[in-house]
Amino acid sequence: MKKALITGINGQDGSYLSELLLSKGYEVHGIVRRHSVAENQDKRLVKNGTSDKVTTHYGDLMDYPSLARVVSTVMPDEIYNLGAMSHVRISFDMPSFTIQTNALGVLNMLEVYRTICPNAKFYQASSSEMFGNSVDEDGVQRLTTPMNPVSPYGCSKVMGYNLVRHYRHAYKLHA
């Protein structure tokens, strides 16, 4: 049975992903922050009926030792890094926190992945905010559209994207 580890499992995308992976026969683990559990009470996991089928572990993207502990315990085949500070408007009020969580948090996950389970697959969630107001000549954003973020959140997601790209090439990881 394949094992998946999801950061941001209490969020909308994380809860839906857990539901999908469970339906495909995966063993699903999620990293949750203590205050995230207190705030959300795993509402989304309860709502979609997966809370009793998912194993959660306490950790934080900014706490490398907690990430290393969880990854060493789970030894996942796939890592889905969906955890982020995802409020664009709030990113203007809290730019340092946004960059730390969304860029340095990605770096922490990549280092744990590289050093503990380098044969796993790694997925990093991105955002259209990476492109800002950029559009192609026909008014559409594509993967070829130049990145031009216009918020701290968008900048942090570009940093995370570039870190994943670097790790994929430098360390030959499946990221």
Language-model-detected regions and their locations in the chain:
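N-terminal Rossmann-like NAD(P)+-binding domain of SDR-like oxidoreductases, especially those catalyzing
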Residues: 1-175
